[in-house]
């Protein structure tokens, strides 16, 4: 398993870091087999897996439950788990308690928090307590209501400078990496140049230190709207629906199960049970 120091070395060597989300055992197992460097158990599971309209309803218990499954599927991959909405805002004590639960109960290697300003103090407190923290700036889904929807952030000089300053504060507070979402490619490149920690982009251009995408988005699985920054490498949803429809048809036509899928009893046992009569 890679350690957090390995990601610093990858940045220094110019080797892109590959991160993908996973929310359950099979997806984590496949991600590890594919050779990803990091897995993010994102609170996006609220929308992707649990069917919520946003990430807001997701709880610490949800994150622990899903991370435990991911750890079982990917025992040798560095796992980052989101701290969900309002689990690190009320007080440092509450943030520490929730982070402790995630780290101890789920098997995560690090936690991720969104935003800057007052969150920077939480990053510092968690780091001081020995919890590795990944920061998340740009489009932060937990704050989408405040941001006015799912929009590109940092498009003008003033807001871009604010994001760059925020990133530097997160780094100074002890963050081990930064997820940068939905910003102009120029800002992504500047962040990667000016920060010593790895900058992992999602819609932040190609010149950052790594990329992260949502598992279901890149595989075309259960998604209705694909963000501009997503490249779909497959469309397994169509394959799944076709397979299920074929199963339905076969059962309705009594074409499944076939002899190859059934079990038989020895004739003498059948005679002993029913006297040779059909049951």
Swiss-Prot record:
Residues that hold 3-methyl-2-oxobutanoate according to the record: 43-44, 82, 112
The protein's annotated pathway: Cofactor biosynthesis; (R)-pantothenate biosynthesis; (R)-pantoate from 3-methyl-2-oxobutanoate: step 1/2
Localisation per UniProt entry: Cytoplasm
Cofactor remark from the record: Binds 1 Mg(2+) ion per subunit.
Top EC class for this record: transferase
GO terms for cellular component: cytoplasm
Reactions accelerated catalytically: 3-methyl-2-oxobutanoate + (6R)-5,10-methylene-5,6,7,8-tetrahydrofolate + H2O = 2-dehydropantoate + (6S)-5,6,7,8-tetrahydrofolate
Electron transport listed as a keyword: no
Family per similarity comment: Belongs to the PanB family.
PANTHER family: 3-METHYL-2-OXOBUTANOATE HYDROXYMETHYLTRANSFERASE
HAMAP family tied to this protein: PanB
Summary of subunit composition and partner proteins: Homodecamer; pentamer of dimers.
Protein name: 3-methyl-2-oxobutanoate hydroxymethyltransferase
